[in-house]
């Protein structure tokens, strides 16, 4: 199969990370994959083995996902959006994919709906129409009004052959965060969680005995980092390593540094996952990929869900993890250095949680589902 995955990450890098993991699973089974990314470059993420196409990049203005900024930080104008659409159209015509996958859309990225509609209409007009799938995480941002769900249903009905829900239905079903109509239910395929291969310990033991603080690969998390810098003063027996994401990480590290704190600050690093099994504990938000890393590694963890701008996705996910051993959840608004230290002491003294019981092979299952649906379409 020739597969095109289209993704635009606007704040963090989780959507791109998941799209790349999904793409690698297709490659590993002998298929050709192109990932078209419309977000800003994320050098900490590997694109090895994939064809990678960078569109003119966009990012959100903080948590305002309706206000999109271009590569220079200005509000993206019509010409910029037109350049993105033209880039995608040229790529589609060149590749003539067998399978087209849109990450998150039409359940999100409404601010890019003209771009996606143009792509989907062009795909329908190809000499051989591709199988069209939507790829979504376990928990979505619930629609703020019924029309948003109705619009998504209309797009699914018009253009899509299936919806890949990257969740284990024993843990979380789509209706936890999104109204599932009869039409949508008929196109949903649960894949299990899309996770990279199981976490393997760092060959040099990096992170051993440390408290690792992270907030994903985007430019958020300064309040969490600052709290950790101060909390490190109260727990000097542990090395606190704070991994700062975003393209401006170096500047923010300078701003966050406190010479009276023993905390170590450095940019987010690509070997972060391999450090987790060695760590004494993790302090992080609760994005999809972070949650899977923690479930796979078994590392004790304090979760501080990202909840700015009416975001509820991470809070819902954290709530589902809270009953498991070795997890504590602290609301961002209530977080203080003292509360963070208390939560860390709690999770580090908790019983070791089992690494079994969750389906982590969602990428492989997605390939199988796509192949089956394509075979049925072309039979």
Regions flagged by a language model, labelled:
Residues 135-222, 245-248:
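A nucleotide-sugar donor-handling region in carbohydrate enzymes
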Residues 7-18, 221-222:
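A short, glycine/small-residue-rich beta-strand->loop->alpha-helix junction that serves as a flexible
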Residues 28-79, 83-85, 262:
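Conserved nucleotide-sugar phosphate-binding/catalytic loop shared by glycosyltransferases and other
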Residues 89-158:
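Conserved nucleotide-sugar donor-interacting segment of glycosyltransferase catalytic cores
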Residues 271-315:
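A donor-sugar binding/catalytic signature common to diverse glycosyltransferases
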Residues 341-379:
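C-terminal amphipathic helix plus adjacent low-complexity
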Residues 23, 178, 193-281, 333:
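Donor-nucleotide binding loops and adjacent catalytic segments primarily
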Residues 1-12, 102-104:
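Nucleotide-activated donor-dependent transferases that construct or modify glycoconjugates
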């Amino acid at each position: 199969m020739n597969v095109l995955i289209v993704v635009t990450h606007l704040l963090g890098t989780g959507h791109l990370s998941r799209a790349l993991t999904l793409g690698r699973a297709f490659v590993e089974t002998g298929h050709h994959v192109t990932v078209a990314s419309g977000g800003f470059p994320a050098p900490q993420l590997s694109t090895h083995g994939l064809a990678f196409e960078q569109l003119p990049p966009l990012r959100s203005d903080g948590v305002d996902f309706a206000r999109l900024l271009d590569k220079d930080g200005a509000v993206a104008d019509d010409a910029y959006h037109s350049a993105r659409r033209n880039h995608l159209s040229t790529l589609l015509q060149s590749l003539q994919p067998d399978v087209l996958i849109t990450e998150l859309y039409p359940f999100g990225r409404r601010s890019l709906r003209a771009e996606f509609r143009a792509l989907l209409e062009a795909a329908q007009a190809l000499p051989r129409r591709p199988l069209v799938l939507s790829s979504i995480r376990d928990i979505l941002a619930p629609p703020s009004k019924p029309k948003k769900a109705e619009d998504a249903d209309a797009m699914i009905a018009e253009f899509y052959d299936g919806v890949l829900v990257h969740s284990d239905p024993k843990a979380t079903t789509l209706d936890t965060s999104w109204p599932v109509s009869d039409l949508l239910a008929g196109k949903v395929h649960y894949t299990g969680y899309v996770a990279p291969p199981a976490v393997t310990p760092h060959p040099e033991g990096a992170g051993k005995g440390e408290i690792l603080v992270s907030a994903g690969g985007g430019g958020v998390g300064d309040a969490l980092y600052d709290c950790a810098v101060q909390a490190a003063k109260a727990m000097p027996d542990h090395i606190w390593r704070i991994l700062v994401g975003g393209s401006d990480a170096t500047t923010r590290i300078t701003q966050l540094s406190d010479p009276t704190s023993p905390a170590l600050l450095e940019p987010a690093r690509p070997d972060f996952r391999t450090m987790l099994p060695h760590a004494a504990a993790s302090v992080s938000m609760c994005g999809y990929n972070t949650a899977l890393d923690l479930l796979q590694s078994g590392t004790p963890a304090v979760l501080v869900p990202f909840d700015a701008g009416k975001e509820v996705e991470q809070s819902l996910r954290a709530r589902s993890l809270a009953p498991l051993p070795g997890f504590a959840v602290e609301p961002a608004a209530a977080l203080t250095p003292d509360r963070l230290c208390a939560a860390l002491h709690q999770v580090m003294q908790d019983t070791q949680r089992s690494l079994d019981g969750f389906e982590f092979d969602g990428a492989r299952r997605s390939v199988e589902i796509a192949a089956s649906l394509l075979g049925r379409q072309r039979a």
